[in-house]
Amino acid sequence: MIDKGISRVWLQHYDKEVSANLSYEHISMYEILARAAERHPERTALIFNNWRVSYRKLKVLVDLAGTNLRRSGVRPGDRVAIMLPNCPQAVISYWACLRLGAVVVMTNPLYMEKEL
């Protein structure tokens, strides 16, 4: 929420056709992924080395990971630490947690036990 008393001086630099306010549909992050998979199923969502993952495939992998997390006992509001390098599995895990309503805690995979 923007405090109406705060001056937004940058707006004076906007072109006339640029809106000062944007309205967004209130949907979950997972719903954004689901819609992308529906609208652009064959478009590339991820590239890792020479591996390309389409939005359709990403959603399938996220749903599978989410199902397994739920079976493991993860529930909405639970905190889930993801301790992976920048790789597809980190992305899939992130979206799977969001699908379940869990809170994602991204950690550095190089952390030692005392740093966690």
Residue ranges and their predicted role:
Residues 98:
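Anion (oxyanion) recognition and catalysis
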Residues 101:
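Structured binding elements
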Residues 107-109:
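Short beta->alpha connector loops at strand-helix junctions that form conserved
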Residues 1-26:
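Flexible, non-catalytic linker and terminal segments flanking ANL/adenylate-forming cores
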